Amino acid sequence: MEVNSKPGILKRIAGPVVTAVDLDAHMYDVVKVGNEELMGEVIKIDGADTVIQVYESTTGIRPGEPVINTGLSLAVELGPGLLTSIYDGIQRPLEVLIQKMGNFIARGVTAPGLDHEKKWTFKPVVHVGDNVVPGQIVGEVQETRSIVHKIMVPPLAKGGKVTKINAGDFTVDEIVIELDSGESFPMMQKWPVRVPRPYVEKHSPSIPLLTGQRILDGLFPIAKGGTAAIPGPFGSGKTVTQQQLAKWSDAEIVVYIGCGERGNEMTEVLTEFPELQDPKTGNSLMERTILIANTSNMPVAAREASVYTGITLAEYFRDMGYDVALMADSTSRWAEAMREICSRLEEMPGEEGYPAYLSSRLSEFYERAGLVEPLAGGSGSVSVIGAVSPAGGDFSEPVTQNTLRIVKVFWALDANLSRRRHFPAINWLQSYSLYMAQLNDYYDEKVSPDWNKLRSWFMEVLQKEAELQEIVQLVGSDALPETEQITIEVARMMRELFLQQNGFDPVDTYCDLPKQLDMFKMIRTYADLAYAAQAAGVPPSQILAVKAKNEMPQVKFTKDYKPVLDKIYAGMEAEFKALRA
């Protein structure tokens, strides 16, 4: 729909930012730039000059070419067909573009976000005469084997009594419900990406988003509807950690945004996810996943769009009552895109050249996470996990600092740990979770009343080891008092048995809470027996030589680990009894 018959004229081109004159447009209108009709968005209006950020390469366009205003905001199509898709930053389906153009996609090519030809089986859940309100669920579509797509009345509709509702096979454009207010709706709706979708109320999160990663679930958990940041230098494992979370977190829907990172990483996700099984349903992980690929060689302006597109898709599934996990890899690349556009606009730079509005844009994004009561009732959540790539691993740079002010969970990746081949390379002394107090009741009721005590003891031992490490490096562990020699050994077991996890091992890649509790207790049992033996006068050299502890790593890599655990407990009891005899 083109509302402005008179096109504007291109006056100035500076990389992804172009200026047009005599264009009748509003802020954030989508425009078509040049003879090739490249997609752009109005970001500044100064008198007769309209400044536009272009979502495709501007190479080859020149002043004098026309600019056409569509009169629409940048919006995404929401409806059946989103899951299993791979989009670019402005919701163009890459698979459809490949069919149109081949592997090298020309500029100006576009395609709708959803397949408008495919028919979906619509099952109504309301009847003629029922009163419906905005956001209410009126029907269902079995989109994949795992996920039922719930069709909702658009949030800005008036609502009213149902006068007609159809059942059967329809495309996303065909009308499925009519109301006495004169409104009628298809299965698809559109929503502008920069506007958060409405809800009734936001709640305080109280259930953990379980990830199957021991260091995260055990020591630094994130809640469903929470926010987390994963900052770390190059090669410390940000992307692998994000991929592990996308694979194994117990969210029902996963939105994975590759924002300005390497193309190979998106390829890995595309090749691995279809082969992996969802531990809850047994179906392919791809069936609950939406991928947004905006790699580092794509135009910078589209990075910002990709983040907003991703969070809008996540909010849509949240409104159906699903728990959604959104991975943004990496928010630093988005901030760099903002910095580049800020400098093209000749705005006053803030710290390190980033725009002065960096923190407000980051807040805008992270604040769209949360556990909410949707308009349809019930509850739904969006958990946001953003990777941050500080140059040289410097956590004092603006993107990391502004992110830490907003998020409540900090998983600090450490290059020293990754160089020692300790993965996931999350530093247990720097990381924190501010959700612990809210989640304590869940762990007490659903896992064990001992969980929180064991976790506190675990952290105390790791802190103690860090304090002793300086002495050990200077004079060796033999110079320490006997109890502290045992503490060093227990901390080593914690690091190697519990905190280290092999993402490429079919068993160790995912560890549920009951198994984590058993591993906590196994290490605690050894520690209690060791301290008791030392108090009874057994020398540390004999305590540290107990053979049963050499069997402990088998627990990590064995699916049916209970017999192994029983054997370890029996071995420890017998050996410590013999030492004290």
UniProtKB/Swiss-Prot annotation:
Coiled coil: none annotated. Its EC number is 7.1.2.2. It is a peripheral membrane protein. It is found in: Cell membrane. GO terms for biological process: proton motive force-driven plasma membrane ATP synthesis. Gene3D superfamilies: 2.40.30.20, 2.40.50.100, Bovine Mitochondrial F1-atpase, Atp Synthase Beta Chain, Chain D, domain 3 (1.10.1140.10), P-loop containing nucleotide triphosphate hydrolases (3.40.50.300). Pfam families: ATP-synt_ab (PF00006), ATP-synt_ab_N (PF02874), ATP-synt_ab_Xtn (PF16886), ATP-synt_VA_C (PF22919). It is an enzyme of class 7 (translocase). Keywords: ATP synthesis, ATP-binding, Cell membrane, Hydrogen ion transport, Ion transport, Membrane, Nucleotide-binding, Translocase, Transport. InterPro entries: ATP-synt_VA_C, ATP-synth_a_Xtn, ATP_synth_asu-like_sf, ATPase_a/bsu_AS, ATPase_F1/V1/A1_a/bsu_N, ATPase_F1/V1/A1_a/bsu_N_sf, ATPase_F1/V1/A1_a/bsu_nucl-bd, ATPase_F1/V1_b/a_C. It catalyses: ATP + H2O + 4 H(+)(in) = ADP + phosphate + 5 H(+)(out). GO terms for cellular component: plasma membrane. ATP binds at residues 232-239. GO terms for molecular function: ATP binding; proton-transporting ATP synthase activity, rotational mechanism; proton-transporting ATPase activity, rotational mechanism. Component of the A-type ATP synthase that produces ATP from ADP in the presence of a proton gradient across the membrane. The A chain is the catalytic subunit. Has multiple subunits with at least A(3), B(3), C, D, E, F, H, I and proteolipid K(x). PANTHER family: H(+)-TRANSPORTING TWO-SECTOR ATPASE, V-TYPE PROTON ATPASE CATALYTIC SUBUNIT A. Belongs to the ATPase alpha/beta chains family. This is A-type ATP synthase subunit A. It comes from Methanocorpusculum labreanum (strain ATCC 43576 / DSM 4855 / Z).
